[in-house]
Amino acid sequence: MATTKVKYPIWLDKSFTVPTNLAYAVYKGNDIIYTGMPKGNDNTTNIYLRDILKNYLSPMLVASDDGYLIKNRDQCGNFSISVYGEQEPRYEILTWWDWSYDNDFYNLVNRTDGILSQVVNTHWHPDQIIPITFYNGTNIHDYYYNRWEKDGTVQSDELNTYDTTYPVSTLTISPVSYINFGIKIDNSLAISWPEKDKRPCASGSLYYINQFGGWDSFLLEYNIVESVDVEKQNYQTGADYLSENFDNSYVIKSLRNSYKTNTGWLTEGQSYKIYHNLLTSPMIYFQNFNGNDPQRLIPINFTKTNFEKKEFKNTHHLVNYELEFKEANIRLRD
């Protein structure tokens, strides 16, 4: 039995080959969750793991204007799928602790489980949450939220350093040699503790679906300028000789918060992840650490995404994105 692990979200992928003379399907119980046919002009075709798993791992967040409070961790679930018509599935093994397509030598040498932080510049904040969706055997869209702090609190000392926890969600893929090769996928949670981790200065965090259907976050470490847009609908009343009455009255008033911030200078690789994942994401939420309810998830829409670039003689450059976004929902007042 060969066992490998895939970090969540699926920034790294796996593939296995299917001969051209075999049809292919993936089942969960009696339900077909993915189908594919080999290409006619090749001897084999590649089936990618992300195509099978993205519907199970992509988050289904529900956040109303009243906000959504972060819940405690629930019991993790596991499920199994089977690949039919394949005799010896071959996997393209990639380093599962790597968040990008480059080798993370620090994690390779010093850690066996990696760290689960936002993938752009690996900065993390104790108030950040990690939403994960898994299949529990009955419902695909079970999910839980966490505030990842040691024993529910942040431990500090005179040096203003903090002991924090890094959650690691792994997917274990085990091809088993039966009549049909099965792929068992266990969504498990392991927690490791670094000795010290300085608490970063940050104002909030963005949570978004990446291009693989997984869930990522980006820590906003610079000032956030907040404003409120107020729109009013009014109606004209008839002539009234009583001075205390209003000739022009408002029927309803709507309020929508707007925010402005920037990412700071990012490298080319970090900028690529922002551009291809955050700015084009179909679902984005904002958590305001300094708001009235720091545990609230706010659905937002980007309204402006300008950037400035520093270019150097070695042809490399740094990019700073100016982000402006609004709450996706309005608040109404009579």
Name every feature range the model reports, one short phrase each.
Residues 1-199:
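Preference for solvent-exposed, low-hydrophobicity sequence contexts
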Residues 133, 188-334:
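Extracellular/virion structural assembly segments
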